[in-house]
Amino acid sequence: MGNNELLEVCNENGVGLGRPATRETVHKEGLWHRAVIVALVNKNNEILIQKRSKEKEKFPGLWDLSIAGHVPFGHDSLSCAASETMEEIGYMLPKEIQLKEFRFMTSFRSQLPISDTFLENQFYDFFVFNSDIPIESFHVQDGEVEEVRYVTAFEIKTMAEKGLFHPRTEWINVLYNYITKF
C-alpha cells in the first residue's frame, strides 16, 4: 500500500482512538498505530525469512520475517495477518484455514526513529502460522525482496546478534521459546 493508506491512530497504550490518518502522516508525526508480524513456520520448525532489497529505503539488505504490514483503518490484526500473507509472499491461503491457523503470540510496542522525518511508533501483534509451503511456491515482489529461505530460530538469533536482521527484534525470544518447546 502507498503513503495514502489509512491507519488508525492509537494512544501510547495501543488503544485505538477511532481516528484515521494516512501512513505518511503517522510516520512523519510519529503517531502510534498498529501493525502485524507473522512468522511462517514449517514442520521442521524452520521460519521463513526474506532479505530486503538493497533498493529499499528502510533497512536495505537486511533479513526480516517475510510477513509484516500495517493494520488498515477499520480492520483487525487477525484478518490483516491473513491478507499480508498473500501480499508479502504471494501465497493465497485456502479460505478454510485463513484465520483459524494463525496463532496469536503477543503484542509489543516498538519505536524506531528512521530519520528526522520518519518515526515508526507501532504496536505490533505477533502471530505464528504453521504451514509446509514449499519455498518455490512463493512469489516475491521485485525491488522488495532479494531472497527468501527457511532458517532455524537459533539462526535468526545469531543473525540478529551480528546485525544482519531488521532492528525490530522484540518477537525473536517469543518465537524461539515457542519453537524450542517442541
Language model features: what each stretch is:
Residues 24, 61, 67, 73, ...:
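Nudix hydrolase/Nudix homology domain
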Residues 2-37, 41-43:
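Acidic, metal-coordinating catalytic segment for phosphate/diphosphate chemistry
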Residues 48-49, 66-103:
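The catalytic Nudix box helix
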Residues 7, 30, 46-47, 137, ...:
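A residue-level structural signature of the nucleotidyltransferase/glycosyltransferase Rossmann-like core
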Residues 33, 97-99, 122:
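Short gly/pro-enriched beta-turn/loop segments at secondary-structure junctions
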Residues 35-69:
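A glycine-rich, hydrophobic loop/mini-helix early in the fold
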